[in-house]
Amino acid sequence: MQVTSVGHAGFLIESRAGSILCDPWVNPAYFASWFPFPDNSQLDWDALGDVDYLYVSHLHKDHFDPEHLRRYVNKDAVVLLPDYPVPDLRRELEKLGFHNFFETTDSVKHTVSGPKGDLDVMIIALRAPADGPIGDSGLVVSDRVTTVFNMNDARPVDLDVLHTDFGQIDVHMLQYSGAIWYPMVYDMPARAKEAFGIQKRQRQMDRCRQYIAQVGATWVVPSAGPPCFLDPELRDLNDDHGDPANIFPDQMVFLEQLRIHGHDGGLLMIPGSTADFTGSTLNSLTHPVDDPESIFTTGKAAYIEDYAQRMAPVLAAEKARWAPSAGEPMLEALRALFEPIMTQTDQICDGIGYPVELRLTGRDHNETVVLDFPKRVVREPIPDEKFRYGFEIPAALVRTVLRDEEPDWVNTIFLSTRFRAWRVGGYNEYLYTFFKCLTDERIAYADGWFAEAHDDSSSITLDGFQIQRRCPHLKADLSKFGVVEGNTLTCNLHGWQWNLENGRCLTTKGHELRCQKL
């Protein structure tokens, strides 16, 4: 089996039984904030797109690139479709002309048969509101000699099914770097922001190592990030200037962490790198350049500068597509968008629990709108009103998502990092869930998900405490992801924390943990 990196989370998996193209992403994403790193635009995409199977893990724009899929990928390819409760992914692929779908069942091993032979596949589908745009997934592929697990940026809760159905995993591709706007966009003291950044940088790599230990693959390929920020307004987000609080470490940083912790099976792959495997044996690893490591080390800043110069026309063209900042007040348009969604979800509106301020700003427009979740209305602010949570977003971006009828502001505005935020207290998961569920179908699913009781009947003992086995957040197994420091429990799946003296969640309201000291 051959595995070729096509950039970011993208891979071409080739075997005698067929070829699978996974998550090809080339065009800038999230209001042109994110570019693939290293540059993959010069690959032979006509050849790469001539495949038997296509796998798109989820709808985040650094995985689902509609323009690229429309232009380059064989429309007769069989799409390996994750088992999602809301069929948005299938609908979007159908719009692009794909018509052959193999609908998988979550975490069930399937055999796909084509003219070249049989492949065993499994797609682990994650369905919580926090997982992607209502869905994220990982793909297992076996040609019955070699088995690869392309986890990309999914965060599976239970991986025992891998070994039950496939035995030894030979190659494991997964995310290790940042893919979020925290803490950079938040108004907070510089020392606090630095401390949170240092903590997040390490935690996300620790989580990745925990997954690697659970899967136990012979070879590990760090993937699915980091992105590259080429807009001069965002260039400081690149990890090329020795900032220990930067949340976007690159492959070389993580491979060194693996070595420090005794794992020598890490592989550096850049766009165009090809690894050939027979079972757990690595037969060869070839790269498109003589010294790929220099892209991430001595030559990184120069590489990014050259990349930015090449992509300046692309960036300018993307910005030209944005709606103008100036225009009519947006209160009525936002009311028409948000209020019908608010009225459909007591779970999420009550979970948010307070009004949220939206400042819409630009050279030609300044407006403040209040999302009053307790009252389920969108209104103007009351004089001298104070807010626990607020955002300042360029008016041009809000006009653009309104014009384009975007169903998900996380997948457009928030991942762009082109905004500011402030809050009193902890992270509010319900708020960001609301912003990613701006359709009747999505909000109905998310409301129902939160309404379901979480199973906390099983218990474990961890460092002198008896606690419920499943994390109150997304049901991760705390015997694998839980870490106790003093009287604080951290679930390393998403970094949420609890006070073990009283079970109170320290990250957000609700989500209490059943626990007692032994």
Swiss-Prot record:
Q: Which SUPFAM superfamilies match?
A: ISP domain, Metallo-hydrolase/oxidoreductase
Cofactor comment = Binds 1 [2Fe-2S] cluster per subunit.
Source lineage: Bacteria, Bacillati, Actinomycetota, Actinomycetes, Mycobacteriales
Residues binding [2Fe-2S] cluster are C471, H473, C491, H494
What is a single cellular component term in the Gene Ontology annotation?
cytoplasm
Q: Which InterPro entries match?
A: RibonucZ/Hydroxyglut_hydro, Rieske_2Fe-2S, Rieske_2Fe-2S_sf
Q: Cross-link named Isoglutamyl lysine isopeptide (Lys-Gln) (interchain with Q-Cter in protein Pup), where?
A: K375
User: Which cofactors, if any, are listed as required?
Assistant: [2Fe-2S] cluster
Gene3D superfamilies cross-referenced by the UniProt entry: Ribonuclease Z/Hydroxyacylglutathione hydrolase-like (3.60.15.10), Rieske [2Fe-2S] iron-sulphur domain (2.102.10.10)
The UniProt entry, under Pfam families, shows: Lactamase_B_3, Rieske, SCP2_Rv3818
* Keywords annotated in UniProt: 2Fe-2S, Iron, Iron-sulfur, Isopeptide bond, Metal-binding, Oxidoreductase, Ubl conjugation
EC numbers for this chain: 1.-.-.-
What's one GO MF term for it?
Answer: monooxygenase activity
What protein name does the entry list? Putative Rieske 2Fe-2S iron-sulfur protein MSMEG_6410/MSMEI_6242
Q: Which residues form the Rieske domain?
A: 431-518
